Each structure stands twice: as C-alpha cells, then as structure tokens.
Design a protein with these regions (language model features):
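Active-site His/Glu-centered metal-binding helix of metallohydrolases
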Residues: 62, 66-70, 576
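Non-catalytic, conformational "gating/processing" segments within enzyme and secreted inhibitor domains
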Residues: 158, 210-241, 698, 719-754, ...
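M16 family metallopeptidases and their MPP-like homologs
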Residues: 45-55, 81-129, 136-147, 174-199, ...
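His/Glu-based metal-binding/catalytic segments typifying zinc-dependent metallopeptidases
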Residues: 37-42, 49-51, 162, 166-174, ...
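Extended, regular secondary-structure scaffolds
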Residues: 211-213, 223, 232-250, 372, ...
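Generic recognition of flexible, low-complexity loop/linker segments
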Residues: 94, 210-214, 271-274, 317, ...
Length: 967
C-alpha cells in the first residue's frame, strides 16, 4: 500500500530530497493532529524519534526531570527502568532522550527490524502511559528528594538531575552561557534553564511536575520522525492503532514566542567559582541575535562566517583579540537550535578592566571587515568546508538519520510547513557561492553584527570560595528547614528516606521483566565483520588498503612510528600535533594554509595514538588523517607535505598563542570530563600505556604546557629547538605506514599523489628510544572548583597472568547497566557510571557527576562479592549478551572501517582472534561471569584510585589518598 493513502493520516507535502537521497513525506495524523515526517531510503540504520515542544516557565528543571522519568516504567512495560533494560539488551545503534531549551525528544536507532519495533513500542508507551502518575518515588529518585537517615542526622538533597546540574553549574562556560541566553531572551522560555538550576530544582513539587507532563505530552503536541529502509506503512498503522487513535485532538499552547529586539545592548556581570590555584581569569562574551530559524540563507551563511571570523587560524576577529592581549582562548560562533539564533564571541583568561576594550576591538574589527571586505579565499574555504560536511554526511558513531532528524527540528518546531527547510540546502549553497563574489557577507556583518543593538555583553569574574559559600548557603537553608519541623515531620522524612531506598533496592519481578520485548541470541550474527586489510607497497613504503565504495572520497592516513622519542620528548610530540596545520607552511601564511586545506579537502588532521600490542611494550603513532575527493587527493598530499617539512616552528608570537589556547582548552576538558581525567591519571600509576597517555594528554601534559607558557621568554629557543628535533625525526620514510580507504580507482589516484612525497622523504635508520617509565601509585584527590566528584578506580588483570576473554565485554555491560547503575546512579544519585576491560589488561570503573566519594569506592571494592553470587537465568543472560554485541556492532561508515582495520593491524589483532572473542561473548553464561571473580580481584588489588572534584569532599576523605592536590 502507498503510505500516502493510509486513511488515518493526511499527506501535506511529498517530494524527493536529493541532498539526502531520500523520499520525504510531511504528514499529519487526522484525529489528533500529531505531526509526522518520514525520510524513506535504503539506509538499514533505521531511526525513530518522538518529540514534544516543551516550554518551561521557570528553572526547576521540570522538562528534564520528565525526560528522565517517563522511561522509568509504563502501563505495558511496568519494569522500573525499561530504558536500562533496552540499553543492556537490545541491538540499538542509538538510544537516548534529550532535553533542549524548547523541546524534549526520545530518539532511537537499530539495524534490526524486530528490535526497532520493540524499541519503538517501549518508547511510545513510556511517553504516553508512564508510571510517573502512579509512583511518586520515580520523581524523587530522578528529580530531587530530602534525604535523612536518622532523626539526629544531617538533612540533605539528593536526586540524579539535581546532581547532574550541580556539575553543569560548576563550569564557568556553562554558567556564562546560561546567563547570556537569559539576558538575550528575557521574555521567552529561553530565559529559563530547562535542565534545571540546582538553586530552584528543589522548588519543584510533584503536582507541578505532573501538570507539566499532562500539558505537553499529548499527540497533538508531538512531532514523530521515521527514517531509513523501514516498513513505513506498518509503522504508521501501528502508531495509530496502539496509541494515537486513543486520543482526541487538543489545543495546546506550546508556541515559542519571539523576543522583541532591544534598543541598546545589555550588559551583565556574574561570578564563577574558583579556588586559589584554579583561576581561569575573566571571561567576556559579546552576543547578538542575528537571525530567525526559518531563514535558510542566513542559517548557512553564519556557519560560513563562524569559520571566516573565528574558527580559522588567524581569523580576523579572533586574531584582533589575541593581538590586543584580551584573553588566551577565543571561541564562539553561530548558536542555533532555537527560534532566534545568535552569533557570539567569548574570550577566556582576560582581565576585568579589559571589558571596554574587548567590545571596542570586536566592533572596530567588524567595521573594518565590512568596509574593506573579507578575504575571498577564506569565504570559499568556509563554503567548501560546509559543503563537504553536508555532502559527506559523516557523523562518526552517530547514525546519520538521527542527525538529519535533529536538523529537521531546527525549523519544523517553529513552523509546521517548514519541515523540509534545513534538509534541502543545495540551492541555497549555490546561491551563497555566487553571493560570496559580491559583498553579501560584508552586508550581513553590517546588518546583523554592527547596526544591531539586539545583544548582550557579559563578564564573568572568578570568585575564590564561591563553591564553599553556595554549599554553606544550601546547608543553612536545610538546617533552618529541619529546625522548623516537628518531631513527627522529621520522623516522616527518615521513614520516607528508608522507603525510597527500599524501593530502589527492590528489583523488578520476573513477570515485569518478561514484558520487555527482546531478541534472543539466535537473532545475533555470529560471524565477525572482516577487517578489509590488504597489504601493498609503494616505493618501499608499506600500504594498508581497505577496498570499498566511498562515493569517490579518499580516506588517507599517513601513520608514523614515534617510538624514537624519549619520555621527555613525547609531550613535545603532543604539542606538535596542536601546531601543525595552524602555523605558516611553505608559501602560505597560517590563515592561507587552512583556507587551502578547506578549499581542496574535507580536512587534514594531525593526531596520535598510544597502542598496546598483544606482546611487548606500548607504541606511539603520529598520523595525518586526510579526506578528499579523488580529484583533490594530490593537492591534499602536497599540502600535508608542506605541514611536515615546511612548517614555521620558529614564529614565537604564534607559538605562544597556540600554547596558551591549548592549555586553556585542556584545562576545561580535564575539569568538565573529570571521569576521563581520573581514569587516565589512575591508569598512569600502574600501566605503561596509561603513563604515556597521561604525559601526552592528561594532567601531566597540562602541567607541561603551564610550565612552557609561564617561562616562555627564557625558554622559547629551547622549545623551538625541541619541536624541530622531534619533527625532523618523525617524518621519516622508514617510520611510515600508509592506510587508505577507497575503491580501485581511488588507489590508482593515490599512487600518483604519493609518488613525489615518498621520493622527497628522508630515509634514515629508525631507532626506538628506551622508555623506563617511573610508574608510581599516587592515589590522588584532585581538587577543583566543582560541586560534585568523578571517582575513578583502575587496575590490570594481565599482571596476574590472566588472559583476555570475550566474557569480559559481557561483564562490562552488566556493570554499566546493573551493578554500578543501581548502586551509583539509582541509589547514590550519580548522573552516570561506566567501566571498561581492555585486551591489554587495563580496566577501570568510574562515576560521573557523583555526590558521593568513599561510598562509591566501597561499591568498587564489593564487586568480587557480587560476582561470586551472580546467578541469572538464560533470558537475563541473553539480554546482557545482546547488549554487549550491540556495542561491538555499531554501524561503521567507510572511514571508520578503515580506522578499525588499521588499529587491528597496529595492535597485532587478527580476524580469527576477533571471531574467537565474538564467539566467547555470544556463548557467555552465568557460570562464565562467576569465573571472572579472579579478574575483579586482580584489578582491585592494584588499588589505584583517583578522584577529581569538590575540595571539601576530597579533604573529608583524605585517608583514601596518598596526595591531595589542586588541578
């Protein structure tokens, strides 16, 4: 049957979307008015998404708390956490729920038809028939609740969203961004924090929460998206029969209102929490509302201007601020995903007294650019970069159908008739190429960035001790509240705390679990994916060819063995990665070089990786990852050669800028991704590969950059000399391995492109450096301005003589969605938890945005006891196995398949070995999990602990640490 003829739906628009090679259908469910958009094509990675327009009128986080809770059981699926059951036991390729400023969405993806409909059923039942209306404890667990274990104990707040947002509000960037948004759109829903401000989350009542749900979660306020090679008729009929037809149309006022422009720029000031040793200087943000989400031309043009003005090395706006000494890290750009997008510039590491000169520098630079014109080559580079991204459709591990769906909402949410707008971009791009030859972009700067008072200038200054102040304020508020309670009311809180814990500790019944639809092991493909590795040679250089169709894009990786570098040189190798491509090379200035890269390629990205082969010591490989259409491959290789052999490593001013910017960005990552920081640091205590990773990307590298930056004047000669020495040894023919993903035609083009480069390469003897790594168990508590913790524990089972087994990947799934999840997230209130078991023996467990510390470490210590008593029936084991396979089988595009083959080759992993591991995963039973007790004991016996987080919490638990220090 033709889906346009299904009687329950009205077809509003249908045509072929050439950019996405898809048939597009915009439809409406006749009875309820539910909006439906379909992209039908041959992609077997199918996507479903149901979204609701949600417009908060306060910052209690009600939208996010509902997002967390509707998937905590429903009428048809009464288990306590269907989302987790799906995550640990389906073949999903994506499974999540997301809260935005003005919408809440529930997307999923799967390549398996049966699995896809199972997932869709659980999601639809969750959003329309959730248990939240029957069980208040779901709201308390995920949102917030009072917690007190005894009448004379301390009264505290707990809740997953409450703790998540305490973490978010520990970041200066996040706080500043939220305040700027509130100032730009004061009369709209954007003035409020949809995720919740910890100060106001505890004002949310259960009744207000249910009222918000009943207001917005109705088919008449829904947006449903289907994508891929899917039986659309079946999906549409099923949705109507099972859910939509049960509702009547309802008028729901969820429209997002426009903010009236300002007559003059606003100014705001705020403080962010800092510690004595943890001060990122003053932040400034300059932001202007520049467009409407329904203006496609501006939507694309401002992405180009983001590159031209800010992102490109030497971009005029960024460079003007750096030259004026206003901060060390400048970033920003086009902020979309809302009704009235803005363009903003932020500088970090400035001084408070520079506020006026910050604004003057931006405005003077923009005026000059509008009058004198932008560099045409830079505009072409920005356009080509955007065009390549749109055509390639490479979103890493995220399904492209998911990402197209997210783009769809940037227009559809604000105009029912504009669903196709941001998917059909080619005509608008063609028009922009023509307009770039004239003064269109300069006029845009004048109209939107100069002659426009609809904006905000914000300043955020560090305040030492603000975290402690806020903690004391919260504690005092709770003390006053407790003092106001009667004895009976206090006993009621204690009783309710106990009841909530009992609720959290009570597992779903066998009957409840069996309501969740699931696959069996028989639905899993047993055969492992091939490696697509064919060894070839070019003029004495080994080539790893991964032959497959790539739409005439060549994915090239030039991989250099960097094991010649001694331990003191490896941080310089890491710094070199930051420098190449953003300094002058050959006849090109650094701005011109990046323009040439973007005009001719889809990117030339230097990088490195630390690998632990099956035998022997770890290895460091430095690479250039290049992607270009076949006809541009030769130019791409020539540009890479210039970066390798003609980069200007002696430009002192540029070098200092790069070191300062890298230091600033790394600091932000170390703090905001504290789970990675703690794992990396703890691994360096016992693991050689962990040690190398840490000195090149972790806290040690940050300290190295700090030292270079603080002593640059006296050491600049030595720094330049070290960089040259590392570079000269690195790009050596004998150290090179070429990895190439394309078809035969592409390979023939590559041979010609590589010929000149290989002939000009030095051909010197290659000698590996001796690495005597000073491994030392430091067990550090690392304090930073944060309201929560990241608690990491690492170890190694191979040190105990134990081999890698596929069942460890099943154990990882069990920990992530059962053992750790229940104890750290459900009961402990941490936002997240994860674990990993590597082939090299290195393992970790870590919590994310965690209010606890010692209690979390105790959970890690009790893992062997849990495994000794582990006993699950076959259905439960099927679920764990399927979840592990799902993680292994994430669909990969050609570029990712090439990287997979290369990584296996460098690590000494064969297809036979991968097949053995897959068989072990599929055949894992409860007995096999119990047999992993020695592994857990071996890992924990290393007792390597690192915690990043709140200073007071770390000092309260100082007995756990050998060292307590600041970040």
């Amino acid at each position: 049957m033709d889906i346009t003829k299904i009687p329950q739906y009205e077809l509003l628009e249908h045509h072929y979307v050439r950019e996405l090679e898809s048939e597009g259908y915009l439809m409406r469910h006749k009875k309820t008015g539910a909006r439906v958009f379909i992209l039908e094509n041959d992609d077997n990675n199918k996507v479903f998404n149901i979204a609701f327009r949600t417009v908060p009128t306060d910052s209690t986080g009600v939208a996010q708390i509902i997002e967390h809770t509707v998937l905590c059981g429903s009428d048809r699926y009464p288990v306590k956490d269907p989302f987790v059951e799906l995550a640990k036991g389906s073949l999903n390729t994506f499974l999540n729920a997301m809260t935005y400023s003005d919408k809440t969405m529930y997307p999923l993806a799967s390549t398996n038809d049966k699995d896809f409909f199972n997932l869709m059923s659980v999601y639809m039942d969750g959003v329309f028939h959730p248990n939240i209306t029957k069980e208040r404890k779901i709201f308390e667990q995920e949102g917030w609740h009072y917690e007190m274990d005894s009448p004379d104990g301390e009264l505290t707040y707990n809740g997953v969203v409450y703790n998540e947002m305490k973490g978010a509000f520990s970041s200066a960037d996040e706080i500043l961004g939220r305040q700027v948004k509130a100032a730009l759109y004061p009369d709209t829903t954007y003035a409020y924090e949809s995720g919740g401000d910890p100060e106001f989350i505890t004002d949310l009542t259960y009744e207000s929460y249910l009222e918000f749900y009943h207001t917005y979660y109705h088919p008449s306020n829904s947006y449903i998206y289907l994508y891929g090679d899917l039986d659309m008729e079946k999906a549409l009929n099923w949705m109507d029969h099972e859910y939509l037809s049960h509702y009547e149309k309802k008028e729901i006022d969820s429209a997002v209102t426009l903010q009236k422009p300002f007559n003059k720029m606003k100014e705001i000031s705020l403080c962010y929490a800092a510690s004595e040793d943890d001060d990122e200087g003053t932040y400034f943000t300059w932001s202007k509302v520049v467009s409407n989400a329904l203006d496609l031309e501006k939507y694309l043009a401002f992405q180009v201007l983001e590159y031209v003005l800010l992102d490109a090395p030497g971009a005029p706006l960024k460079q003007a601020l750096l030259d004026a000494g206003i901060g060390v890290d400048i970033y920003g750009g086009f902020e979309d995903g809302i009704l009235q997008p803005s363009f903003e510039v932020t500088t970090k590491g400035a001084r408070q007294e520079q506020r006026e000169v910050f604004v003057e520098t931006i405005e003077a630079t923009l005026r000059k650019l509008a009058e004198e014109g932008l560099q045409k080559r830079s505009l072409l580079a920005g356009l080509n970069s955007l065009q390549f991204r749109l055509k390639e459709g490479d979103f890493g591990r995220w399904p492209k159908g998911l990402m197209y769906g997210l783009d769809l909402f940037d227009s559809w949410l604000y105009d029912d008739k504009a669903a196709f707008l941001l998917l059909e971009t080619q005509d608008a791009m063609d028009e922009l190429y023509k307009k770039a030859e004239g003064s269109y972009f300069e006029q845009l700067i004048k109209e939107c960035l100069i002659d426009n008072s609809f904006g905000v200038v914000a300043m955020a200054v560090p305040k030492v001790g603000l975290d402690a102040e806020n903690e004391e304020k919260t504690a005092e508020k709770l003390r006053v509240y407790k003092d106001s309670l009667s004895k009976e009311e206090i006993e009621e809180i204690v009783r309710h705390t106990k009841e909530l814990k009992e609720y959290q500790e009570t597992p779903s019944t066998k009957e409840e679990l069996e309501t969740i639809p699931m696959l069996t092991r028989a639905d899993i493909k047993r055969e492992v994916l091939p490696l697509y590795n064919e060894e070839r040679s070019m003029d004495g250089v080994k080539v790893l060819f991964h032959e497959m169709s790539t739409k005439k894009i060549g994915y090239l990786e030039l991989v250099f063995d960097a094991d010649f570098a001694d331990l003191s040189e490896l941080p310089y190798l890491s710094l070199l990665k930051q420098i190449l491509g953003v300094v002058a090379a050959g006849e090109y200035s650094y701005t011109e070089l990046m323009d040439e890269v973007n005009i001719h390629t889809g990117g030339i990205d230097p990088g490195f990786v630390v690998l632990q082969p099956e035998t022997g010591r770890p290895t460091v490989r430095f690479s250039f990852r290049i992607k270009a259409f076949y006809h541009e491959l030769e130019t791409a290789v020539n540009l890479t050669a210039k970066m390798m052999y003609q980069s200007d490593l002696a430009n002192e001013k540029r070098l200092l800028e790069i070191i300062g910017e890298t230091r600033s960005q790394l600091y932000e990552r170390l703090k905001s991704a504290g789970h990675n920081t703690s794992i990396k640091r703890a691994s360096s205590y016992h693991s050689e590969s962990g040690y190398l990773n840490e000195i090149m990307t972790g806290i040690s590298f940050y300290e190295f950059l700090n030292d270079l930056y603080d002593h640059f004047e006296e050491r600049k000669g030595m720094i330049i000399e070290k960089l040259r020495a590392v570079s000269n040894q690195l790009f050596n023919k004998r150290a090179l391995l070429v990895s190439f993903t394309a078809d035969k035609e592409g390979y023939d083009v590559l041979k010609k492109a590589m010929d000149t480069l290989i002939k000009q390469m030095p051909d010197e003897p290659f000698v590996k450096a001796d690495w005597n790594m000073p491994l030392e168990k430091k067990n550090e508590g690392i304090c930073c301005a944060s309201q929560i913790q990241f608690v990491g524990r690492t170890g190694n089972y191979k040190d105990a003589g134990l081999p890698f087994r596929g069942s460890l990947l099943v154990l990882q799934n069990i920990l992530n969605y059962d053992y750790l999840w229940i104890r750290l997230r459900v009961k402990g209130g941490a936002y997240g938890c994860m674990s990993g078991f590597g082939r090299d023996g290195d393992c970790y467990m870590v919590s994310y945005l965690d209010p606890k510390l010692a209690e979390t470490n105790e959970v890690y210590d009790k893992l062997p006891e849990y495994l000794e008593q582990f006993d699950q029936d076959e259905r439960s084991m099927d679920r764990y196995v399927i979840g592990a396979i799902s993680e292994m089988d994430i669909p990969k595009n050609p570029a990712a398949l090439g990287v997979r083959g290369l990584t296996a080759y460098l690590s000494g992993i064969t297809r036979e070995q991968l097949q053995k591991e897959r068989d072990e995963v599929i055949d894992t039973d409860a007995k096999e999990i119990r047999a992993l007790v020695p592994y857990a004991k071996a890992v924990l016996s290393n007792n390597c602990l690192c915690v990043v987080g709140n200073e007071n919490k770390i000092k309260e638990n100082s007995s756990l640490f050998t060292t307590v220090r600041s970040l």
